[in-house]
């Protein structure tokens, strides 16, 4: 159909419209361990993260990203990597499939244990968020006493998600390993739906922390404004 009846188009319309499809959620199968790290970075550190990514890919004999890549997904032996370059931060997400009996004896290892330790310790920028997430194909919390090894019961909170098809647990604590933690009981949730849910949880944690960066300045400004109000009242 000819489009000559349409008004003049913005030159970036198609690019902006397609941005929603640039980083789609990945289908996931439970059980799986996921680590999500957000590094707050300036322009130089964001470029350094690209070089840091290239070093990992080179060590794993993988193709290098091009100079303009802003996101990448790759299978790297024992783990899968998802890297995303944002305006003010860089996210690194690692996922490791777990065996079906991973919770039979004790809580499973974190996904970061599959990542080269020295390389991980040198991520460019400042760590704003480090979340460890375990996804399990069950809905029975009472059958998982090992959760006590991961989450503090005195601050444990839970919420029903995905219209009641799953439950997520967290304790809103930063643990000794520097990570916050979540456990998602996903039951028999379909892989694509599970992938969308996990991406939402990771984004909630990312932007919760990013939004709170302004809190110290807001508190400081609040005391200044309170003093100014008293001055005006006098």
Could you say what each language-model-derived stretch is?
Residues 84, 95-234:
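Extended alpha-helical interaction modules
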Residues 1-129, 134:
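N-terminal pre-transmembrane cytosolic regions of membrane proteins
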């Amino acid at each position: 159909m000819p489009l000559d009846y349409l008004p003049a188009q913005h030159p970036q319309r198609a690019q902006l419209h397609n941005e929603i499809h640039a980083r789609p959620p990945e289908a996931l199968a439970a059980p799986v361990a996921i680590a999500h790290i957000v590094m707050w970075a300036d322009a130089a550190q964001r470029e350094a993260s690209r070089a840091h990514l290239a070093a990992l890919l080179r060590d794993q004999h993988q193709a290098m990203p091009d100079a303009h890549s802003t996101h990448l997904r790759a299978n790297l032996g024992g783990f899968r990597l998802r890297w995303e370059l944002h305006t003010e931060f860089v996210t690194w997400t690692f996922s490791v499939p777990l065996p079906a009996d991973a919770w039979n004896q004790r809580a499973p290892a974190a996904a970061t244990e599959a990542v080269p330790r020295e390389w991980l310790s040198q991520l460019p920028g400042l760590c704003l968020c480090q979340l460890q997430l375990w996804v399990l194909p069950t809905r029975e919390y009472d059958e998982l006493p090992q959760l006590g090894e991961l989450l503090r019961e005195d601050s444990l909170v839970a919420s029903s998600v995905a219209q009641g098809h799953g439950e997520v647990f967290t304790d809103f604590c930063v643990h000794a390993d520097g990570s916050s933690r979540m456990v998602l009981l996903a039951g028999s949730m379909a892989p694509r739906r599970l992938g969308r849910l996990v991406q939402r949880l990771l984004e909630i944690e990312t932007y919760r922390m990013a939004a709170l960066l302004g809190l110290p300045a807001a508190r400081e400004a609040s005391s200044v404004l309170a003093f100014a109000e008293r001055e005006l009242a006098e």
